[in-house]
Amino acid sequence: MQASPLSTEESVLLEQGRMDFDNGRYWHAHEAWEDLWNSLKRRNAEMSEILLVQGLIQTAALLYNHQRKKSRGV
């Protein structure tokens, strides 16, 4: 299965999230990827793409909570 191309806006959100994540700004990465996730859902993208981004969001949330030494979810 081949992923559908991202729109320009979606590509920006993916890259913004990656840069935030790489710089330890996990909450900002979470927010950027959540916007991407919502965009993918609105245009009925493949479920595998939606779930991949959902996994990125969950990973960012986990690391954000770890960074804050919070033992419970967001």
Residue ranges and their predicted role:
Residues 47-48, 72-74:
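Acidic/polar-rich alpha-helix caps and helix-coil junctions
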Residues 26-27, 71-72:
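TPR-repeat structural position
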Residues 19, 57, 64-65:
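Residue-level signature for tetratricopeptide repeat
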Residues 31-57:
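Short, charge-rich amphipathic alpha-helical segments embedded
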Residues 44, 67-69:
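Short coil/turn linking the two alpha-helices of tandem helical-hairpin repeats
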Residues 1-11, 47-49:
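TPR-adjacent "capping" and linker segments in tetratricopeptide-repeat scaffold/adaptor proteins
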Residues 21, 26, 33-34:
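Inward-facing hydrophobic residues that define packing positions of alpha-helical scaffold repeats
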